[in-house]
Amino acid sequence: QRAPGQLSGGMRQRCALIRTLATDPRILLLDEPFSALDYQTRLSVSDDIHNIIRREGKTALLVTHDISESVSMSDRVVVLSARPGRVKAIHDLSELRGLTPMQRRDHALFHTYFNAIWKELELSA
């Protein structure tokens, strides 16, 4: 029972996703969806959004500069070069499929993927 301006950042993100899902889109575009959230809220909301997307059987395109976020939320990570943006590499994260973002962060392969993506970004800098 709060006015929209009184909601926390995490609740606003959840409401935005629910509002988007109400239109029943086939594909969701999530452009830096967690950038305005503190770290603890970011982890909680990412699990919630991941679960909603899976439950609803949706495809989501996540745009982020946060490597941890990309590995924890995605089935596939596409690394782009600097301008002009071209596909530099594609990482298939199928070994992590079925895990929540929090579970992925604890998985041994999380750091392997993170480091591989980081190295590619360093090379393009």
What are the functions of these language-model segments?
Residues 2-5, 23:
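Conserved signature/switch motifs of ABC ATPase nucleotide-binding domains
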Residues 17:
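Hydrophobic anchor residue at the start of the ABC signature
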Residues 28-31:
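Catalytic Walker B motif of ABC-type/P-loop ATPase nucleotide-binding domains
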Residues 42-57:
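Helical segment within the ABC ATPase nucleotide-binding domain
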Residues 57-63:
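Conserved H-loop
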Residues 72-79:
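Conserved catalytic segment of ABC-fold P-loop ATPases
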Residues 82-112:
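Conserved beta-strand-loop-alpha-helix hinge in the C-terminal portion
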